[in-house]
Curated annotation (Swiss-Prot):
Residues annotated to bind ATP: 45, 468, 564, 592
A GO term from the CC aspect: membrane
Gene (name only): ppk
UniProtKB keywords: ATP-binding, Kinase, Magnesium, Metal-binding, Nucleotide-binding, Phosphoprotein, Transferase
This protein's name: Polyphosphate kinase
Family classification: Belongs to the polyphosphate kinase 1 (PPK1) family.
Function per UniProt: Catalyzes the reversible transfer of the terminal phosphate of ATP to form a long-chain polyphosphate (polyP).
Enzyme class, broadest EC rank: transferase
Catalyses which reaction(s): [phosphate](n) + ATP = [phosphate](n+1) + ADP
Amino acid sequence: MDDSSLYIHRELSQLQFNIRVLEQALDESYPLLERLKFLLIFSSNLDEFFEIRIAGLKKQITFAREQAGADGLLPHQALARISELVHEQVSRQYRILNETLLPELAKHQIRFIRRRHWTLKIKTWVRRFFRDEIAPIITPIGLDPTHPFPLLVNKSLNFIVELEGMDAFGRDSGLAIIPAPRLLPRIIRLPEDVGGEGDNYVFLSSMIHAHADDLFPGMKVKGCYQFRLTRNADLSVDTEDVEDLARALRGELFSRRYGDAVRLEVVDTCPQNLTNYLLKQFGLSESELYKVSGPVNLTRLFSVTGLESHPELQYPPFTPAIPRLLQKKENLFNVLSKLDVLLMHPFESFTPVIDLLRQAAKDPNVLAIKQTLYRSGANSEIVDALVEAARNGKEVTAVIELRARFDEESNLQLASRLQQAGAVVIYGVVGFKTHAKMMLILRREDGELRRYAHLGTGNYHAGNARLYTDYSLLTADVALCEDLHKLFNQLIGMGKTLRMKKLLHAPFTLKKNLLEMINREAAQAALGQPAHIMAKVNSLTDPKVIRALYKASQAGVRIDLVVRGMCCLRPGIPGVSHNIHVRSIIGRFLEHSRIYYFLNGGDEKLYLSSADWMERNLDMRVETCFPVEGKKLVQRVKKELETYLTDNTQAWVLQADGSYQRLSPTGNQNPRNTQATLLEKLAAPVLTAR
């Protein structure tokens, strides 16, 4: 099982996922603005890929610490393959934008008007807007010995300008840089009396190109070309060597804007001598240069995808269901004392989770609340309820993961807010990210203390709960709540790992038990008994888990996997993974739930988890994995998982060579769209009595 040909390179697999995202932009079954959104998500994903993954590979090379993964590729070999693939896909992305999406948008009177098509009225309006709103904010920088090349912010829009002539001081540098401040909009909507009927926009870059002369009076502008630099954005706080993690992170957040260069994007009209000059300034090679036929910062077009004037070009709105029993506005503690409630977001509302916390904040019988927070978003109702609870005298403890990537700053702010309200704030465990999603409420009832809990596969983020598929379990199960109590004490205090009755948790018992359950299925198959594993995760990269799955496949276990993103396992290899089937679902909602199912000799075991099957999750994070109990709930989740395995419109099947093949209905097959089916049919949760 150590043969490198049995494994797919992690970063190459991640790129394959992003290619599947880009493919959605060509899918005419989606509304037009949603197709544009997929194209922009491709850009956003690629930005993070370069900021984190490419930066990490380059760092290994720089410090001569190249290490091959299970696939055998060294970082410099992987970078060569990645560069070739990304160049190909970025060119394709701009072709889709320019040749397909923009013409289609224009048919619906959504236009991005290029300079060559500006009317006199538009030119006049743009000149006035540039003079009043843009020029006062822009600071052009001439390049000479007293004006060295500026330190440019990560992913900022900039222009390199070729000049001719001498300025008032007799300087003749020939080059200047125009940084475009982030506060400036990248697209500007024209008034209807200027642009005409519909939604008409001009690019900020076009405005600056048109009026660059105004920024260098008396000099001739020979050329003005936009470019964008991507930098290493991974934080490098040594958690073992800092006394105050919050203070150390604040310092690193500023440094992140100016990390090492990893990619240069320039408009394709930029002359070779100028691109060479920029590459030299940033210490980049030709393979790290991306010439694009359009704006270099496509992610700033996201504002257009939610146009109120064109609801017909967007997904139809929907209202997540509220369980009928919970619609009665009954005290949630009374409900949960009798029943477990399982919710599948976004098809079912996240509101009951928020309501439980709100009721706890106001309830005089509630004594304490403990909560983990990884990503919560701006204006979080969850955080509002925790603040209210603390102000009402409850013992509120929040375990906040300050190192949640790209949410560090907002998490620092909410930590301060909770501390000011009187809550106890803990920053997790040194060396281990707290990724678990759990809430525990302690309430006095009839002279006794009783616990209530929420466990989830997704974040306490109401916005994500409308866009991501996730599960929530609301419960008063005594054993599960006792396990959570132990885990919170372990996070907040000190002590050895305590034995859990039901909960599996990383980095202690989850991986060990996961491997044991896989091996148990293999043992069943070896005895000629039925054996089946089904799982749905975001990523599968852990070599130990992959090897266990290979051995189970060899023993005869049928293994059905739904892996949205990275998958380093190769299915369909004769004699190794011929019993393993892997598919990825890409659709309206981001697939985010983690489900593990084992036939277990007929005594079915089904778990929900916050953890993907990755080394970082199973070995280096605090994660939870909790059982779904009760025949009705088990069958419900099992059927929902099986729905993903029958999808033939949003499913992409992984081939042994690492490529993906999109499924479509064949013959007399009816189209089966998992997300549409769940959206239509999932009206209320199944409740199970205890």
